[in-house]
Amino acid sequence: MDIKKQDTRRFKEIKPKIMYYGTSTFLLTTLNEDGTTNISPMSSSWALGHYIILGVGLGGKAIDNLERHKECVINLPGPDLWENVERISSYSGKKSIPPLKKQIGFTYKKEKYEAAGLTPLQSKTVSPTRIKECPIQIEAEVKHIRLPEYESSFAIVETQALHFHAEESIILDENHINPSKWSPLIYNFRHYFGLGREVGKTFRSET
């Protein structure tokens, strides 16, 4: 095949301000100095084995908490919780809000559970609480925080899953998640989506 003869006219190079091309939204809970829990809506994460890598913005309460207390819970909401997530999307748990965040509308709010209409659950071994309304809650330990030399706006946080909690309605055969029952909340270019119908599965699927 001569790739030089392929028609490329239906494509156009653009320069989007954001690269949120469709990933799972999650609510990261971390421990405040006074022992209370902070909730941070996020969408940058990926998993490999039992390790979950998080992209966490600098200047916020989440990274401050993770640097001081290396535990967290990765709470995964379903599409029905998008409004709860959005209620706290413009809040920061940090009193001294960075100028850039303040400029785009962020304000201070400590009681995020109340603001979001969500309920705390005690975790099994970590100090930050889990979120009852989220069908999946992953207690995790921070293994490493890396500040890239090429970018000063975020940290790459490597975590190890310690305990994986799932709502009984989405569990299949004891230790599997039923893909037909579980739909994550997807953050797609700053819009919220659920999943559509299944189109297929990988050869390694056990369900």
UniProtKB/Swiss-Prot annotation:
Its cofactor is FMN. Keywords: Flavoprotein. Disulfide bonds: none annotated. Coiled coil: none annotated. The keyword Flavoprotein applies. It comes from the Bacteria. InterPro entries: Flavin_Rdtase-like_dom (IPR002563), Flavoredoxin (IPR052174), Split_barrel_FMN-bd (IPR012349). One of its GO terms (molecular function) is FMN binding. Belongs to the flavoredoxin family. This is Uncharacterized protein YdfE. It comes from Bacillus subtilis (strain 168). The gene is ydfE.
